[in-house]
Amino acid sequence: MSDIRHALLRRDPLSAAKEVLYHLDISLGSALQSSAGPPAGLEKSTVELVEEFIFHVSKDRNIQSKRMSCVQELQLLEIICSYFQEQSKDAIRQVIFSALFSLQGNKADESRMAMLGKLVSMSIAVCRVPILECAAIWLQRTHSAWCVRLAQVLMEDYCTLVPCAISTLQNICSASPRFCCQLITAVTALYDFSTDELTPPPALLEMLVGWITEDPRLLLLTFINSPLNSSLPLGCLEITPLLGLLRWCVKAPLAYHRGRKSAMTNGHGDGEKGTAYEELYSKLHLSVLQVFLMLQVHLTEKNMFCRLTVLPVESVAALIEEVGRLCEKLAPLLDASHIQLALDRLAQALQVAMATGALLCAREDLRALCSRLPHNNLLQLVMSGPVVQPPPHSSPFQPNMYPHIHPGRPSPLSPHSPHQSTLSSPHSPHTVLTAHPTHPALAPHRPLTAHATHPALSPHAFHPASIAFPYRPIR
């Protein structure tokens, strides 16, 4: 390997980089064909060649690395794009891509990320699907912090620097849906609504909603194509973008109202745009709920229903806790309807996720978490669980009861409530009248005589809606 290095040192930077690519193709391709699977790892000498002659980070501090000019760097990107486009074997492409851009935990990682961001951005512009497919696998196996950095580079190129370039990114969905699925996951991890800068740009939001409404199965693409028993590396992105999109939908009513309030303070309020954002998030929320239903079908077909978690309980608990803090912090500044909208979306998502098997969590545990949230009628019903059916011999008009999720507040529907009364059936031929302090007791089992002179009762006379129940709805 030292002979190869000395030969490469005599070449110009661009020629040396091409020679390293050729060397990787020969050595890793041969190793892949001779073994049953991909090589476990690269030799240290091979890694050093890649770092020194492609990313220009020399292992020898005494030797000044040859830096490429901007034109040479662009030429190198074209060479890499052409190599992956011409390589017909997907397994070899994946191995070479991993050899180039797998992070090693050293000073060369910054150069790797810089080159990777430019390569993926260029591949989107010229639609190099093989590189986008390799980048999708990279996003699936790499720590989320690096994935977020790559997503940030792409968002700056296609949403910030050249806003009209978003249409180029939008067209990639049909060419490489796997890459788009992973990009959505990375983008939802990038934009967490903590600041105005970390709020999804309108063009990005509109593009993602268009992708998902056109084909909601896009969100499950990585999950469906991954082995069910496979374990992801520690710290990597979620297996689906569902949790990240759910976080967007729940936090959007709070964050966007904050943004509009700031804009109106500065005299730049735009109500029409705010309404458009709200509609986009409503569409996105509906699509997420629909994907949960699709997920249930897939889990049932694979005999993994209620056996494989898709939404980690820890992540859902963190979201609930975060929403609680935001509601408490922003309550004096927000209209109550915005907080209720956020809680409504959270309640709907939790109910559908539990019903479809995406969230495996005891309802009692969720009830304890949600008890810290502001009161919300829908969340109250969801966390209370199924309706408690009355005993078979009780009154037909006795209301069903829900246990309250706020333990410090007694439920008005408690069976021990002093306002609870029992109604006897109006159709019983022998009505038992109980004793009353101001009236004489009637003989037991005294049949009531028919009143022929009275007009016939309306068929709706004993409809439950016509009876005033002694309880109030949950508020």
From Swiss-Prot:
It holds the Pfam family INTS15. Transmembrane segments: none annotated. It is found in: Nucleus; Chromosome. Residues 402-444 are annotated as: Disordered. Keywords: Chromosome, Nucleus. Its main location: nucleus. GO terms for cellular component: chromosome; INTAC complex; integrator complex; nucleus. One of its GO terms (biological process) is RNA polymerase II transcription initiation surveillance. The keyword Secreted does not apply. Residues 416-430 have a biased composition (Low complexity). Component of the integrator complex, a multiprotein complex that terminates RNA polymerase II (Pol II) transcription in the promoter-proximal region of genes. Component of the Integrator complex, composed of core subunits INTS1, INTS2, INTS3, INTS4, INTS5, INTS6, INTS7, INTS8, INTS9/RC74, INTS10, INTS11/CPSF3L, INTS12, INTS13, INTS14 and INTS15. The core complex associates with protein phosphatase 2A subunits PPP2CA and PPP2R1A, to form the Integrator-PP2A (INTAC) complex. INTS15 is part of the tail subcomplex, composed of INTS10, INTS13, INTS14 and INTS15. Belongs to the Integrator subunit 15 family. PANTHER family: INTEGRATOR COMPLEX SUBUNIT 15. This is Integrator complex subunit 15. It comes from Danio rerio. The gene is ints15.
